[in-house]
Amino acid sequence: MLDPERCRVARLSRDARFDGRFFVGVVTTGIYCRPICPSRPPRDDNVRYFPSAVAAAQAGFRPCLRCRPDSAPESPAWHGNHTTLHRAVRLINEGALNQASLGALCDRLGIGERYLRLLFQQHLGISPKAYALHRQCLFAKQLLHQSTLPIADIAHASGFTSLRRFNDAFRRHVGQAPRTLRRTPRAPSQDVTLMLAYRPPYAWEWLRDFLAARRIDRLEWGDEHRYGRHIQWGSASGHFTAVHVPERHGFRVTLSLDDLGALLPVVRHIRRVLDLDADTALIEAQLRRALPATFPLVEGLRLPGMWTPFEAGVRAVLGQQVSISAARGHVTRLVEALGEPTGDDGRQFPTAARIAASDLAFLRMPQARRDCLRGLAQAACDRRLDDDPRQWTALKGIGPWSAGYAALRGTSHPDIWLGGDLGVKRALSALGTVEPAHATPWRSYLTLQLWSL
């Protein structure tokens, strides 16, 4: 439940730490805003507070054109702690209902359509399809404000199959025609540049150094202020570069994709890789219950995501019982040998099919580890890999550490405790009393805090 007084103080002070944690509906104008909206604050008796943008929209409010709620970071708190609902929301945000049916989504979740509708009504007050349409319209609004894409391309990128359907849905959800948001003509560009926001603080220096120590040349790149890599999503391929802009509490992300139909899920994936939606104040309050009072907590620490669970699994196998530097060498050789070349002398991460078809003789490691890697790749080719990497321990050579690492970095699961990790063991030995159970459901962040020592 939202605390009205806390919300009032946050909106009057425009506290960026609350951005995306609630939204402000203004009764006199019929619009809803972020708590950081630069407009003159309305009177208390003209305000209603909502836990999410979708809740504000359901109540009949339209998004503000000045603070742009479509650009706000999300808060995982508003859809509760229900695991199935979390998965459903994540898949819908990645475009699961753009081209596929509700039945296909339910098959992926292992539940019936009626049960999924019930979950959405109970927790969100909206049907799954209505939620998906709301997300599509907000993403389209973000593209209209920030990109130079033609409106027809924006409709396609937002998951609409026709321009007419897009225009109708946009008018209903935003209250205006899409063309009215294009106030200033700009030269068109093949690339898409978006500002992706987070709630401060954000420990960019920690994340930057973590990624740099594991960066694979020609697949990834980075420097003091940016991180980028080549990516694939289904049949689409491209690359992105994210530049940290701390004064705006966000990243300026430039994307190049050969199929704009993949843009919505790719942007959602970039948000996950950079962990932009984490509520670090909430997380760190829980971690302090598990750690000694003198522990030097890294404020704003984020989960360093990988592009896919499969890539995370491959890197976990290649990192078994070796140093970070040695693991990086193994992954580099794999990418050089099997990664699909890109047009700019880069490489994509190797597909499961190419790894499964190779004898991997170029990898200097025990044969059992090569067999494990090929077994993982073959399972992916055969569609035998569970969506949750923690279930991969049935595969020969995949133990709890590898499965947990793949879940932590490949799906950004927030509650992975790698208690058997050597770095964690060393930290525990130095600290003495640590209570991992007290950090639930944020033990992934506890693991990373211990790695930071």
Model-derived regions, located:
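HhH-family (HhH-GPD) DNA N-glycosylase catalytic core used in base-excision repair
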Residues: 1-453
